[in-house]
Amino acid sequence: MALWGGRFSQAADQRFKQFNDSLRFDYRLAEQDIIGSVAWSKALVTVGVLTTAEQQQLEQALSVLLEEVQADPQAILASDAEDIHSWVETKLIDKVGDLGKKLHTGRSRNDQVATDLKLWCKFQITELKTAVQQLQQALVITAEANQDAVMPGYTHLQRAQPVTFAHWCLAYAEMLARDESRLQDTLKRLDVSPLGSGALAGTAYAIDREQLAGWLGFASATRNSLDSVSDRDHVLELLSDASIGMVHLSRFAEDLIFFNSGEAAFVDLSDRVTSGSSLMPQKKNPDALELIRGKCGRVQGALTGMMMTLKGLPLAYNKDMQEDKEGLFDALDTWLDCLHMAALVLDGIQVKRPRCKEAAEQGYANATELADYLVAKGVPFREAHHIVGEAVVEAIRQGKALEALSLSDLQKFSAVIGDDVYPILALQSCLDKRVAKGGVSPQQVASAIAEAKARLF
């Protein structure tokens, strides 16, 4: 039975009911709805609506219902209830009779669903933070094992300067640390309870909403009832967090797809995260990474869709806001799955050090070192930059690396170049010189790994 039938003389058209009902997705809020109902029953005791004995009876029945939901949440979907609130109330009445009809006193589905969703978001943030931390840990472990794996760093997808695979791993660990920080910031803002705001104007019962918030584990209660039932900022923020996080994972996936390609051949991916071709027997496709990259779009779409849903809504609650859940649920599920999959990819990755080093030695990745060498000899940097560009052209013409050019060849471009240039152009020297904080020198990379381990393990 609908919770609002008294006003109507005709039953809802079945097609409208199917269009209007939300149980098929908001059943995921069942645990939160029950937890909120227990807290609300306690609040009703404080204002004389329920006796202590009645509240205890309701709480016991709700606790049994919670256990049933936890044992088989999918069983909820067999009901034709309009939404999860209707389902919980109906089940409660089945257990305790008319006493269950008293529970909704002073409460609206507007503040009820806002509370349920915030409680769900709080739990989900905890899950996501754990997954983000686990992926950071996987990156740090991989970095520690590959500190000596020299490879080319890229700009414009052109070889630029030598780095290490460890330094690459730590770059993504930094991105994930920001993702974790964003989740924590989102939690701070959503950690206020809307329960007790009623439909829009507040409840007529003198309930201590701060006490109620504390029972639910919120830091405080909201300050304005209109805003409380209208606010979906936390949905937007979480979708934004997920969108940014998925951009990071998509870039991670793209890098590894390239590193795994036959053209780069820097890494081998585990058989556990790759698949084959139905036609070409030689293929080993990076499907896990391609799916991570592909799923980024659906998460961005959820954020855009939610922003468009909210942008024209007047205060307070509107049915449009029922559209807040499916996109949020899917986006956060997707992000969580991709975080786990990215960690699995790293678990079995093999870095091909000889090939990485070979690539780093090509493409004139040490050209900047020659420019810095000239600067140290008193040549202005802009002039040094031009000189090295000419030297690179000559090296390309001869089909040689910069360090393979003879001293006489190099001195054609600048007389200040001496024999001491050759150690400077060595690959390891290029790394060793990057000693400033955040650089790719072995000392800085080791320090960054130590800092990350202290934070994460």
Curated annotation (Swiss-Prot):
GO terms for cellular component: cytosol. Pathway: Amino-acid biosynthesis; L-arginine biosynthesis; L-arginine from L-ornithine and carbamoyl phosphate: step 3/3. It is an enzyme of class 4 (lyase). GO terms for biological process: arginine biosynthetic process via ornithine; L-arginine biosynthetic process. It holds the Pfam family Lyase_1. It catalyses: 2-(N(omega)-L-arginino)succinate = fumarate + L-arginine. Its main location: cytoplasm. Transmembrane segments: none annotated. PROSITE patterns: FUMARATE_LYASES. GO terms for molecular function: argininosuccinate lyase activity. InterPro entries: Arg_succ_lyase_C, Argininosuccinate_lyase, Fumarase/histidase_N, Fumarate_lyase_CS, Fumarate_lyase_fam, Fumarate_lyase_N, L-Aspartase-like. Its EC number is 4.3.2.1. Disulfide bonds: none annotated. Keywords: Amino-acid biosynthesis, Arginine biosynthesis, Cytoplasm, Lyase. It is found in: Cytoplasm. CDD domains: Argininosuccinate_lyase. NCBIfam families: argH, PRK12308.1. Belongs to the lyase 1 family. Argininosuccinate lyase subfamily. PANTHER family: ARGININOSUCCINATE LYASE. This is Argininosuccinate lyase. It comes from Yersinia enterocolitica serotype O:8 / biotype 1B (strain NCTC 13174 / 8081).
